[in-house]
């Protein structure tokens, strides 16, 4: 029948299966996402709710495991997309063209058994990947098709065909497969010849809520695109959605749930040997893990501080003179320097932090990296006459953003509105009452918005303001505005760390000069178009995947 199939994909489904809701599209999605994916398969679950398999493992003697058999199908280790040795033929999808190139199931395995394993090996032989898709769930009433007695009926071919399979693929099995039951962590995802990275952060990156999470998410995407196997440990071990599923569909193993929260040390001890790199984020999270990893791991430790907390808080002290801020800054300084001295490499988003660290200790290995990474770029045609309003974007869980908006509303915006009647849109998660309850004429508090709505605002507003009075390092909101080609007016703190930004954005610190600059550029269409064009050229040059990878690849390779 399959010889007459006209569709792009062939689907094989046993007669003893029951498909679950929304089972088909996830299989198609994997095929369409990557042209090198040749075959995909479903998560198979028994009728009693236990897992039958999350992909299959073949050992070097041709014996096989249904990975995860009789485990909880909702456990995190069974819910990420990954390469797999084979997929049980109860529910598999293959490219029709590839199926015909291979010639279908090898007839030496007629009438049953090992034909699915052999097909997976043929798919790889032809240059394609075999993937497991956990979002496609199929109940398999195993045994109904061929029974369970290996001495009778078609079931008797199971042992016989395993011997045939071993003879056909002996060299491949001995070269690329593990002895039975060994190194399951690697075997389950065909990870023998891949580098593995454990990424630790405060929680699964909620990239539409704060700049730090967006940075983490972008770096995860880049590392996956470079072929690394990623395990992600969020310190709260919570399954935030839709963010967790998005990582899992990228092929990232996310640790979540009580099993890992209560036993993370035991899990790390058991699997520490498999990680080539430990990529740790933020000082208050890293301090919990770095000593344990340093003591027991062989892999390299890379620490990304996101910003220098002690520098940011010291600047806040310089602004308000509160003694407790000075004390807090000193505590952060002690902790951050301790972490940096334990790490093999330290990342910060600008030369400002690198210089500040080396002024304290020139021996600390530190590198200025690019905070944001873009795979694709927009071609923005900036039309001032179709835009209106001034936009601020920043999460209010970060104190400098709250201070910036309050200062702008108090000292800058009243005169701006009086002169140009431009509405002020405030976007950011975790907005406190003093922001959400604002009733000032012209001020529109949007609070948290989706990525789609944020993009609409970037495409409809005329100007972005970043009126930060303190902070440290490169500001993600500035980079994002550059990406969307929307002109920026900012302070020197907002512009910090972005080399050459003064040739693109308008930078002013003094209140009246900032007011004048906003009013002037807002009404100058020619200048707005010029800034937009320069912004897009700049971000393409500095923030592409290739540009970022050139900076960090030596640390990961």
Q: What spans do the regions from the language model cover?
A:
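Conserved donor NDP-sugar-binding/catalytic core segment of glycosyltransferases
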Residues: 17-59
